Every structure is written in structure tokens, then in C-alpha cells.
Amino acid sequence: MATTIRCARATDVPDVLALWRESGAEPTHTDDAESLLRLIRHDPEALVVAEVDDHVVGSVIAAWDGWRGSVYRLVVSPGHRREGLGRRLVEAAETRLVDAGALRLQAIVVETDPRATGFWRATGWEQQVGRLRFVTG
């Protein structure tokens, strides 16, 4: 099984959304085709996927706003976990963002998900204590 890490295409959007649902990722109101297609149009390199045998089995959003790099939606299919795909997706996101000029990267992680927080700690990223995230919409 050859694994490819690449930028997502518009045709990947249904598979990415299905991956998010099947993996148990915490849903948000922007988990829809229109939002992902808008992301790809705005920044064609932001959504990165892992593909095995022509099937999307992982994703990460590596968002660059010109100031700071943000990593969202790191998801790996349950059937492909513990194969190093999460780490490869994070490395692809880091490379994309650092190459774009980001000096600081941040990851948005569900605090109550021990699998996710454990993964991020294992990658060497540090939890920033004392900060809260405020959102609207």
C-alpha cells in the first residue's frame, strides 16, 4: 500500500467530509462541502490529504494568514491509525507553513480528547497553558 501526501482537490471534498464523520472528529458548523471548496479556492495548498490506494484516509488543514500558521482538522481514518500518517500529515503542514514564512505554528486540538492531546505531545508540540480561545459564528 503506497501512501501519498498531497494537496486536496475539489473532487476530494466528499471523501474528506466522510472521513471526518467516520473518524468521530468533533463536528463544527463549517463541516460542509461549500466551506471546504471555498478553502481550496482561497488557498489551494491549505487542505492536505493522505491517500492510500486512491482512498483519502487522512487530512489536515495548514492555514497561513501571512503572520501565523495554524493547524486544524488533523484526522486519520480509524483503520489507518498507528501507521505514522498523523505524523506525516503534521510534517507536511509544518513544511508548508514554515516555507511560507511562519515563525510560529499553533494547533487547535480538542482538549477533552486524550488521543489527540497525547498525539500532539508526542510530536513535541507544547500545550500553551493560560490561554483561552474565543470564537464567534
What label would you give each PLM region?
Residues V49, H55-A63, S70-V75:
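Conserved beta-strand in the GNAT
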Residues R121-G130:
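Conserved acetyl-CoA-binding loop of GNAT-fold acetyltransferases
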Residues A107-A116, V135-G137:
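Conserved beta-strand-loop-alpha-helix junction that forms the acyl-donor binding cleft
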Residues L37-V49, S70:
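A short helix-loop-beta-strand connector motif used in the catalytic cores of GNAT acetyltransferases and
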Residues L74-R81, V109:
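A short, internal acetyl-CoA/4′-phosphopantetheine-binding micro-motif in the GNAT/acyltransferase core
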Residues R82-T95, A122:
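Conserved acetyl-CoA-binding loop-helix of GNAT-fold acetyltransferases
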Residues A2-V16:
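A short beta-loop-alpha structural element at the N-terminal edge
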Residues L97-V110:
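Conserved GNAT acetyl-CoA-binding A-motif
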